[in-house]
Amino acid sequence: MLGYNRLGINGRLGNQMFQYAALRGIAAKHNYDWVIPPLDHTTIPMAEYVLFDGFKMSSVKESNFGFIPQDRPTYDEPSHDFDVNLFNNCPDNINLDGFRQSEKYFKHIEDEIREDFTFKDDIYEPCKEFISQYGCLLYTSDAADDT
């Protein structure tokens, strides 16, 4: 079983999306079960665990909520690059940590991840007309902008 005990601590929504997707992708590659912190967890101070606020997260079942025991190893990322060794050789029964900001961790289960990250109806419905009229909008911020 793989877990991400600090989900909600290492960054906000975008980071949590990558961390969740990477956890799911690595677990799927090795046919491992996986867990994420329960929605009502208060064991981690200052956690901003927001994945379930806006997304349906339809593949998450009750059995997917929990923690990896603290006596199990935690694997932190050595850099912000894709960790091919972790992806190909991940041991079972560990806790993942770090940001895991690469789609390579979950590209093979992209459809499942997209389904989980479907907006909840109360968010999507008010935006539906705008989206159909203008299509998908993408906002990017370039820190090296010369303007």
Q: What does each of the following model-derived ranges do?
A:
Residues 8-18:
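A short, glycine/small-residue-rich beta-strand->loop->alpha-helix junction that serves as a flexible
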Residues 19-27:
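Histidine-anchored nucleotide/phosphate-binding helix
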Residues 32-105:
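Glycine-rich cofactor/substrate-binding loops
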Residues 106-138:
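Mid-sequence helix-capping/hinge segment at a functional interface
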